[in-house]
Each structure stands twice: as C-alpha cells, then as structure tokens.
C-alpha cells in the first residue's frame, strides 16, 4: 500500500455537520475496558441522492451498514475530548437499499488512566443524513430508540496488556453474537435493552472532523510457521513469524471447534525454547495476548483490531488442530498516509537502512506519532521532531505532524509547559511527568512542519502555544547568569544511555534548544503579522546566545562544557552549538575539526544535529562515514545484525521498533541524493548531492507541495550523469561538486532534466 484509499471515507478538512445525535452507552455506569454493541433499523425510500454518515466514539468503534464495515481501524484518532473530539464521515449511499436497513456499531471504552489517551467517559455518537432526489432530507441519529446488546461477545474489564495500560486484552466469544445481528429483520426476545444517554452532554465535547487518515491494513503477511517449540511443555503451542516487527494484529482463519479458547500471544522475540516471550519489549508482561472462543463453524475468521499491537511473533495456544498455511495472517496496519518518498543506491546495506527507517516509521504512526508501537504508543514532542525528518520527506504527513502540535496545544499546562506526552492522563501519578527539553521541541517541530509545507496556517495555529511555552522558560532565567536553571521534571540532553554530564544548575543543551525555540517563535511571529513580537523573541535569542558563550564556552579548547559545573566537553554538545551558530566565528573551523575528528559519542538525540552540522560544514565524508558504518555504534550495526527495523538506541536491549532513529532515511535523500529545500514549501529547491567514492549511483524521490521531486546521479567511465524531475511551479537548480574541484551550477526546468558532465 502506498496510500490508504477508502472511497467511502469523506476526507475533507472543511466537512462539518450540525450534531443532533446524542451520545449513548449501554448503561450509565463507567467501567474500565467496557464495550457496547448498538443496533438501529430504519427505512429508506429510493431514489436516494446522497447519504452521509458521521460517527464518533470514546474511545473507538467499528460501524457497519447492512453488515458492511465502514472505513479503517482504531478510529477515531485519540485526542483530549474536552478540547476536541474527532469524528469520521463516510458516503454510504451505495450501501443503502430501498426499504429496511440496519446500522450496527461495536464501541470500546478504555478507561484505566493509561499513558497515551485521555480517560473521558464512555460514549458513541452517530448521525446519518439522508438526502433524496426530491430534495427532502431525514436524519437517523443515536438516541434512546437504539438497541444495546445485553450479552456481548467482548468480555468487559479485561486486564491491560502493558504496564502503561495502553490497550486491553480482547477476549471475544463468537457464540454470543448472532450473525444476523447486523442485518435488518433480526429479532431475539430479551436480547437487548434500550440504549442509555451517555454521561457526556451533547455539547460537552467540541466536535472536529478528523483530518488524518484512519488506520489501514497496508499488507497481509503470510506468516512462516516455526518448528514446534522445545522444552517438553504439555501445552500445544504453534508459533508464527511475520518476518519483521509490525504494528497491527493477527487474523485467524481456522476450522471451528466449539467452545475452544484460542490464545494469541505477541512479542518481538522468542525465548530459548522457541516460545513467544512474556514481555512487551524490555518490560515483563504476562498479558500481551488476546483470546477468541470459537463458535464451531466450518471456517471461523477473527482479528483483534480494537487496538494496535506490535510484534514479530505470534504464538497460538489452546487450538487442538495443526494450523495449515493461511490459518494465521498478520495484518500490518498503521495510519494510512501515502508514501511518496524513495531512495536507493549501489550499497545494499544503505538500501536496507532506508527500508528499515521507513518500516519503523510506519509502525509508529498509529492515529498519532508514537515513540514505539508496543510498550508505550505515546506521543512525545522530541520523538515527533526527530520522526518529522523522515515523515515529511517520505509521506503525505503534514496533517499527522499538525495533529501532534494540536494534541500538545490541548495538553498545555497553565504555566505554558507540557506533560511529557499527549494525549495523556496527566492526573495519574504514574504519568505526572515533565521533560523540559522536550517542551522546546514544540517550536522547532512547528517550524519544521511549516518549512515542509509552506503553510502559514501551521504557524498561526501553533504560535500562541509556542509563545506561552518559551515565555515560561524566559520567566525562570537566573538573574546573574541569564541562563535557564534546572527546573521541575526530568532533564534529558541526549538519549538513550547518554554520556552528557548534568552537573550544576545550567545544562548547555537545554540553553541551546531554548535559543532554537526562540528563533522559531520569532520567525513565526514575523510571518503571521506580529512583527514587534518577532523582534522581541529574536532579541531574546541573541542575548541568550551571548550568555551561553560567556558562561559555558571553553575558549581554550574551543568546546562547550556539558553543564555549568561539568569538566566534560561532549561531542554532541558542541555539535548542536555549531549547528545553532553559537561558536565564535574565529573558533568555528577548529571546533568543527575537533568534533569531526573525535570518536562518535552521541546517542540518537544529539546524532541528528551532529550529522547535519558535519554535512553542512564541509565535513560530508565524516558524516557519511557515520551513516555508512556497519559496526557498533550506529544504525548500520542494527542492519548488520539482521534487523529490519530501527532500535531505540545503539544497544540491542529495548524497543526494536523506535521511529526516532528513522531520520537517516531523510539524510540519505537530502545529502546523498541531494534534494534540498531552499525556501519553505520547496518553492526554491537545489539538487546538490554528495557523491562518496564508495557509491556508483544514488537516486531518490521526495514529497513537496508542488508534487514529487526526484533525482539520480550515476558515475560512468566518462564522467557523471544526472537526472532530475522537477514539478511545475518550482524553481530548481543543480549544484554539482565534481572530483576535480569544479562546482557545476545549472538551472533545472520543469519536467525531466538529463545532464552529463565529463571528467
């Protein structure tokens, strides 16, 4: 799947509806991991011009029209419903028939104060607007006339699968749902009760059309059945390998054995006996499974798709028969954004690195950008800022990033700071956490989304949030030093397993990130008509930059100290300072050389500014060497170990599908292929490749607001051949450094460009 396409899904930003429908639930009681099964019959008279169906749920629902399931999965996308509640819209005209029709919905409420959502209250809301050819209109809406199933196939109150209470075990008993339930004419005395008004008032939650695509099944993976596990267990276990870690769920297609409880357990890895481990990455969990109780049909199919799981291996227990090929399929699912980026070159390990970055990014876009798709599924500003590198170059993802910004706007605290993730149950003591450095990424993420899209609306929407955030940090500056001291929360300069020292009250990386945030806020203000404020924030950034140099720069060694009382001069601290332009001009070349020639000590967070600084300052060879290496540490080491996804850090010990390590994909496209934006929105674009001696060709394509841009360079016996495709409306140039020291400058035209440069 290159993009999610559902013809019934109405995906228009301007689509709105006046809500008449009530929020309903099956009772007035709030229970964790609760379900409700709803049903409504109604009449349609043809000819029907158009039928639009709108629905929302807290937290998710699956809606059926005459037995046909609508749309995608794990919908609506998570938000703080008190600030905005997403709803979906579908054109269902073709699904309705003359006469009696039936709507059904299966809704799920999580509750439980988990890490990556907002508890809110249970509820389901649907409105079907029927427009006839004669101009008349009718509305079918949720109210007390809807039926709710008394005894549901989904068990209520099942345990959470992770320690962070992200998703619940689906325990589904197929015997409890009559197959005719979803069709008009079903009758069963005493099987239903009238739906109750939910505890949510009709106007309590602001309704907003969902702007990002729904979850979609991208690929149905035919699993490889592994040999029977060792260990002599009495339990009959059958283990299946999807070939890589995927987000999604398994699908069963098995001969039914009535009353048999089939358990599906998930993990990234296996134990020494070939069984699926009882864990969620590096955290123990005995509950990372779902269960299906069989009805006894000749063929039964089922998939636990109310939540995203992430795993490579599926272990089936409880089923007494040998499972043949096709009995277990893994559905790889994620937010259905179109992939438009590409990269390939003559080095296969770099092609595998790019593919692993993209696969990992897909795994971590699940209605929100998440750090990992299994342990937390949580949305962090810093993680999204790093992910935005690959996201915005390779996918139609501006709306996905905009949702992250909106989620943090909704979560912003009174003083302008943020919880460490959003959405979140911040009142839960387990998740009452803040990371000050991560707050500062809000402003740089906002600017990054603007640079990719050229859409000033992103700045208008995020400016007040970003302004309030930087104002907080300005308000706590130390009067003597002018620097921001250690404050509430958990401070991170680099991650994971960092070696940056945090000694004293003032952390250098935090100061530099505040400078970058102030600059972003200042530029944003200027672009949205608030020039005076823009000038003020630019002045704050300049003064803070001066204070950082005064207080934290070692002029003798041409390096920045890690913190105010540290004797360490970490590579990454000076790298981010160089990237931010804070090193005095007279020392800059020596500082660049010092960082470039040092052994690699940065982790994931500081390796991005390190690489960008090297590529942008004439040290392309050193930067490429870090991308190209296959030994520890680095991304290539993961590939050399056979991993098809990116890990949380360099070590093979925690999450093995962590998207913040996916930014090498963008760096390969931007620096090796050479596709670079010169102005926000790619109105001006330069093709300037770095052509390392170890490669004979490299090619790539990226998404821009004007359309795709592609480029390819290739060495031949006689010279270098370059091809570039430029969309209409874009101003583009080729800047090509040749081996003899010449730099070729040439304008590119709309459409195909092919050039050859002799040795």
Question: Locations of the language-model features?
Answer:
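Active/binding-pocket-proximal capping segment
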Residues: 61, 70-73, 77, 408, ...
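Active-site acid/base region of carbohydrate-active enzymes
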Residues: 60, 125, 143-151, 323-356, ...
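Extracellular/oxidizing-compartment recognition motifs
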Residues: 1-375, 383, 399-402, 415, ...
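Short helix-capping and inter-helix turn/linker motifs at the boundaries of alpha-helical repeat units
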Residues: 32-33, 242, 378, 436-437, ...
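Non-catalytic C-terminal accessory modules of carbohydrate-active enzymes
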Residues: 127, 141, 147-182, 186, ...
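Alpha-helical support elements that line or immediately flank enzyme active sites
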Residues: 51-52, 249-268, 306, 317, ...
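C-terminal capping/lid segments that line or modulate ligand- or cofactor-binding pockets
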Residues: 155, 163-172, 376, 394, ...
